[in-house]
Amino acid sequence: MNELFYTAPDLACIIDNWDLTVNDSSDLIQKIFQQDKNFLADEYRNDYRKLFLDVRYWSDYLCDKVTFDKEFPAIQKDCGGVLDDTNFVNDDFDLDLFFKSLRIKLLYIGEKKYVRMKLRTLLSVYGYKRRSKEFIFYLKDCLKFYHIQTSLRGKICDVAEINLDDMITFRVV
């Protein structure tokens, strides 16, 4: 479950995806630290400065990722090859980033307090065409962890039982 907590790279990616200004992103980081502290990774829960600086670092990295990735072999050589490159050159963010982004959008960024989408669209975010038991189990874990409720035509629904083309409404409860 540790992968479900907000990390600096996650927040930087969300800020980048929503194209927030520096002031808006600073306000967002502060709101998350003050109001959503329980969802932050352990290393950030009691250290706003570390959270802020790490998110800024990763935001800068995302702005010029191609250049940083080109320079990484030289940096690795200078450090004697001891740096772990998985966080730097990996283009695949965690699948749970979708739910982190959804929760943050609903609470802090968007004007609406709900998001609607088809289950088929949600599956395509993960690269699936059909729902599997494992996917539904993971989906339910994320929904429960982030306190996100799903409803269909105003009634609470179970994502395992609805049709792929049903329009689901997501809300933070």
Where are these regions (language model features)?
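Charge-enriched amphipathic alpha-helical scaffolds
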Residues: Q35-D64, L123-V159
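Charged, low-complexity interaction regions
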Residues: D16-S26, Q34-E43
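Short helix->loop/beta-hairpin flanking segments within DNA-binding domains
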Residues: L97-K113
